[in-house]
A protein has these predicted regions:
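Non-catalytic signal-transmission and effector/linker regions of two-component phosphorelay proteins
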Residues: 1-15, 116-134
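Acidic catalytic/metal-coordinating carboxylates
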Residues: 43, 69-72
Length: 134
């Protein structure tokens, strides 16, 4: 039986875990830069499959997904992949924010968020320059 190789790299890779196509498109437009590689999955099982092969620098995680809640997935990711930064995004109320942060999310953004908010969060967590590429 062969072991799967897990790819790790210093490149700035971001995994977006979001089931809404429009939100994914918006995030892709906002975040497409030469120094960031974006990957996208639509559910938690897809995220787990992706993480078993490639570990990103940062995960943008929606809360309400077809196969579970992102807020519950945060603690799992932080235990198994402690170096991965997590930006939780949700349209739910402040109680979700509190739980997400308690579970280990590095930042929380409430939908709808602005381009500046998401870029500020990512730049801060990945130590990227403050200038805007667009």
């Amino acid at each position: 039986m062969s072991k799967a190789t897990v790819e790790t790299t210093t490149a700035q890779k971001i995994l977006i875990i979001e089931d809404e196509g429009e939100m994914c498109l918006v995030l892709n437009i906002l975040l497409s830069k030469d120094d960031i590689e974006l990957e996208h999955v639509k559910n938690l099982s897809g995220a787990e499959e992706h993480l078993s092969k490639q570990i990103p620098a940062l995960i943008i995680l929606d809360n309400k997904l077809p196969d579970g809640f992102g807020v519950d997935y945060v603690s799992y990711v932080k235990k198994k992949y402690p170096s991965v930064k997590i930006v939780m995004i949700s349209g739910f109320d402040a109680s979700v924010k509190d739980v997400a942060l308690e579970n280990g999310a590095d930042q929380f953004l409430e939908k709808p968020f602005t381009k500046q908010e998401i870029l500020r969060s990512i730049r801060s967590l990945l130590n990227l320059p403050e200038h805007d590429q667009r």
